[in-house]
Amino acid sequence: MVQVQRRTGGDKGAKGNRASSAPVRSRRMTQDDWSRTHPDDIFSVIEKTLVEDGYKWNGVKPGHCDWGKLKESGAIDNFRGTLEGELGKNCDLTCNAAAVKLDTLQKVKMSSDWTARVGIVLGAPGVGKSTSIKNLLDKFGAKHKMVLCLPFSQLLEGVFAGRLDTFLVDDLFCRSVGYGKYNTMLVDEVTRVHMCEILVLAGHLGVKNVICFGDPAQGLNYKAGSAVNYNFPIIAECYASRRFGKATADLINSSNGGGKPVVGNNEVKDSWTFEELCGKILDMSTVLVATRETQKFLLEDNIESILYSDAHGQTYDVVTIILEDEFDDAAICDPNVRAVLLTRARKGGMIKMGPNIAARFKNGDFNSRGVSKSCTGDTFCEDR
């Protein structure tokens, strides 16, 4: 969508094929020509913080976004169409939020000279993205006028609970916030939100710096609203998890469909067992499922479970993942669904599955039979 630099070849915007998600390497800079000469710049601050936290800093300049780029690329039209689609559904809170955003789109002054620098930070589950964000807010939030935007309410718990500088994206659209009150916007779990939504919000608030954190393995990145389609540079990345151990990392890597390999923490002792559907669930474990159909099926036997999309951003000591051939075959073919299910446990757990899905895990064969209907760039999650 929003092109950071001109390229020859087949890159297209929101209405065509997705642009490359590769970092922009042609504008590489060394530490000498930026962070050392601009130590107080927010991107220098973020570089220092993330490098200390174990991230690889890619040494690329942030991308730039303005109203002209958003309009010319088709991003605004795609976002408007998404919102109008939500209004046509039978819903309550989602429709109210969509109506507010549509109203904002109509009223915002797109002729203004607003421009923002944008960078993407990628990290595997458990690398400490939320902890790094919290550290940035604690140490530099006041000086750089930071605000943290979260796509769904579960993230308001845990390390972000009770913070006065942290809001849901929907809430910031609805609140009366003075233009220019915030200078830097941090976004967690960016793969769960339409990227144009973030950029419109930044323009609406007069934000000058947008830094988005996320795990590409947990987002449906082929959707038009995904951050990868905007070709913003990946400024930092880390794939060494502190949360889970080698067993979980091996399981993820054997079924990730060619994504970036993750590294487990050797100090964490985790394990996984695979069983048929019959039999008991692990004691004291949290039950996770891939579809609402399986969730309803289990509830008939008084087994409560958590849908994978509701577990996004959450962690549990031990999990039991239940996968029914009848309901879950298409969903488990989605690498994003697998990534969420397999990375919620700190100590591993058990996967109980039907014979067809068991064969998929054994053979590493997850050829897609369908598309997940989870939160994507083309639809918003009703529990936001």
UniProtKB/Swiss-Prot annotation:
GO CC aspect terms: host cell plasmodesma
Main location: host cell
Residues noted as binding ATP in the record, renumbered to the chain: 123-130
DNA damage found in the keyword field: no
Domain (+)RNA virus helicase ATP-binding: 88-238
Region (Disordered): 1-36
Database matches in Pfam families: Viral_helicase1
Compartments it resides in: Host cell junction, Host plasmodesma
Residue intervals of the (+)RNA virus helicase C-terminal domain: 239-384
UniProt GO molecular function: ATP binding
Keywords noted in UniProt: ATP-binding, Coiled coil, Host cell junction, Nucleotide-binding, Transport, Viral movement protein
UniProt GO BP: transport of virus in host, cell to cell
Origin superkingdom: Viruses
Lipid biosynthesis keyword on record: no
Homology family: Belongs to the virgaviridae/benyvirus TGB1 movement protein family.
Quaternary structure and partners: Homooligomer. Interacts with movement protein TGB3.
Record's function text: Transports viral genome to neighboring plant cells directly through plasmodesmata, without any budding. The movement protein allows efficient cell to cell propagation, by bypassing the host cell wall barrier. Engages in homologous interactions leading to the formation of a ribonucleoprotein complex containing viral genomic and messenger RNAs (vRNPs). TGBp2 and TGBp3 are necessary for intracellular delivery of TGBp1-containing vRNPs to plasmodesmata.
Name this polypeptide is given: Movement protein TGB1
Organism per entry: Beet necrotic yellow vein virus (isolate Japan/S)
